[in-house]
Amino acid sequence: MKKLLTILFCAICGASIAAEKPGADESAKTPPGKSYTYKQSGGKPRELEIYFPPNHDPAKSKVPGVILFHGGGWSGGTLDQFRAACAYFASRGLVCATVEYRMMNKNDAKLPEGGSNKRVCVTDAKSAIRWFKQHAGELGIDPARIITGGGSAGGHISALATMNPGLNDPADPKDIDTRVVAYLWFNPAFAPADNKDPEIDILTHQKADLPPAIVFFGDQDKWKDGWDKAQAKWESLGTKTIDLQIAPGQTHSFFNKEPWRTVTLIAADKFLVKHGFLTGEPTLKAPATGEKLVPASPK
């Protein structure tokens, strides 16, 4: 009898633990994309993974390209964060890359007084975007239709890589710019302390002509204050291209987990259709649990 009770107790505990784990659609890992080395930095090769549409023929097809940068506080994170997103966008007809970049480190090469270690992240992101454009022919993408974005630190990095004319790697081709035509920003992390180094401060590099941008934030995200300041400045400049979507009750990085991963990807898909980068309807199904984003009212 004692043995039976022990077995039952273990079974109940196991069921409780299983209930706390992510669902199969969340915990299942998306296979890596095709790996390419886009540069050497910090003594290491830097990789990006690319996902291609079904039956994609680079010789015949030049589709928009998407390049996404993972989060992780500028000092961590992995390519896995956006593999599912890249695979989905590829299934919809885009060529999509997720990028590894050099992490900030207090022991990095000498920086000017007040310089932030985040600089190395931005420099690598600029190199990745240039590489993506430079190899547009073999990848089957249109270099004039590149979309970028990222999550948290990756959102910050993608913004500075495309807005700051500085922080270039001397080895990069000088005739290729880092301009893009749209942004997919998943709670981009714009820190107040960035104002100590203008090179990595979003408020230093904002202009009125921001390309269309969709931005996702949980209304309980402590990083939203930094975004609010950036959005207020864009609006003061006359920018009208920002589509801010709020996830009620959610905190930072909510988009990494289901059902919000699917909810944000569907919204990003519709945004890309609206601006002519995709056609048709999203192929993902909205969660049966009914979670929805709320469009933010203009300030």
What are these language model-derived features?
Residues 20-61:
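N-terminal cap/lid segment of alpha/beta-hydrolase-fold proteins
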Residues 60-72:
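Short beta-strand element of the alpha/beta-hydrolase
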Residues 79-99:
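Short amphipathic alpha-helix adjacent to the substrate-entry channel of hydrolases
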Residues 114-137, 266:
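Alpha/beta-hydrolase active-site loop
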Residues 127-208:
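Primarily recognizes the serine-hydrolase "nucleophile elbow" in alpha/beta-hydrolase
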Residues 192, 219-225:
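Acidic catalytic loop of the alpha/beta-hydrolase fold
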Residues 209, 214-217:
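Short beta-strand/loop motif that positions the catalytic acidic residue
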Residues 228, 235-299:
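C-terminal catalytic histidine-bearing segment of alpha/beta-hydrolase fold enzymes
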